[in-house]
Amino acid sequence: MKPLIALVGRPNVGKSTLFNRILRERAAIVDSTPGVTRDRHISEGFWQGRAFRLMDTGGYAPEDGVISNAMLEQTMTAINDADIVVFVADARAGLSYDDLELAKVLRQRFSHKPVFFAVNKVESPQLAYEAASFVSTGYTEPWCISAKDGSGVADLLDAILLEMPESDADQEEDGAIRLAVVGRPNVGKSSFVNALLGNNRQIVSDIPGTTRDAIDTRFTRNQQDFLLIDTAGLRKRTKISAGIEYYSSLRSEKAIERCEVVMVMIDAGPGIEKQDLKIINMATERKRAVLLLVNKWDLIEKDSKTSKQYEDTLRSHMGNLAYVPVLFISALTKKNLYRAIDTAREIRDNRARKISTSALNRFLEEALAANPPSSKGGTELKIKYMTQIQAAWPVFAFFCNNPELVQTNFRKFLENRLREKFDLKGVTISLRFLQK
């Protein structure tokens, strides 16, 4: 993951203006009304060739009403998740009680994190002089900046760059298969993990959203190491409040980015819903392999045909995602728990497999014989050969006379045949057509 920089401070100190200045775009709403930024805003930025994620947060105002309390929770969670914190104050408004309180929290609870204290709106020598009063926060060397005109921002970013950690993408390449357990709240993710590991490692209750953090657990099965990431439930965006729940959802998305196989869990009772499909899409968009786990299967009245009928109904709702394998489990009775892990390992191994060019071209010859591509505009598509490109997921290159002649149905045909031929169920694959 790219390092995360969080902008925190009271409402209306200029965090959103600084956010936009750093990103050189108006990505956040800027308004003179305190507290306009109630939700988080996260975008990717670059400075001196280094990439990072920048987070704008709602204002820290602990003495105000319910909304501000949610914004306070948001600020605390943002600080906890961030690699670097930029604490923003307002030179025009002067030092406030809330500034002192936030400074106290940062020094006492987050002393292990790099904190840059930026006094914003310093747009005159007089304001620069008055900014000296902010040393009473305990930060004796505040950065005097103006997010509005950009003065001091480059120097601040240069200093931040020196504290910025390297991306941790390469730090997890230790041979362990990385699995993420994701799904809507209260579908049984933590019960699944606890049953699998044989301990009550997490609080399990009927209250949706009990698990707020993404929690990593290592275990070994059949001499293979696994890293299991259990996450907070992913709700619809419209149901995510302005506080801690959004950040729980953010952690789930981060877990998907970190893993190789996403185990999407649904509740057998209500079945698959739009949000489940969005979660699967989120995983496939990030080119992750996917396994669909139907939990609480023990609660379903069934006969010998039930699982087949249920799976058929699932796939009818999944459309282009119908290639995702389905496994019926019960965290309560431990039905198919280890089979889920073994299946995830098999999917991951297939995702990492390199298929020889000779095998691919034999496949291509058979596929073209079975379903020759139709012509387009009187011109016939001619595919000369194919190969697999080196990537973290299977990417297949087809060399042809004109890539624009490739029609959607034919592309889908090749994708389906590749999955069948080379056992790529659950694996996101990419097809690229290149002119030769």
UniProtKB/Swiss-Prot annotation:
One of its GO terms (biological process) is ribosome biogenesis. Residues 3-168, 177-352 form the EngA-type G domain. Pfam families: KH_dom-like (PF14714), MMR_HSR1 (PF01926). PROSITE patterns: G_ENGA. CDD domains: EngA1, EngA2. It comes from Chlorobium phaeovibrioides (strain DSM 265 / 1930) (Prosthecochloris vibrioformis (strain DSM 265)). Residues 353-436 form the KH-like domain. Keywords: GTP-binding, Nucleotide-binding, Repeat, Ribosome biogenesis. HAMAP family: GTPase_Der. This is GTPase Der. GTPase that plays an essential role in the late steps of ribosome biogenesis. NCBIfam families: GTPase_EngA (TIGR03594), small_GTP (TIGR00231). It comes from the Bacteria. GTP 1 binds at residues 9-16, 56-60, 120-123. Associates with the 50S ribosomal subunit.
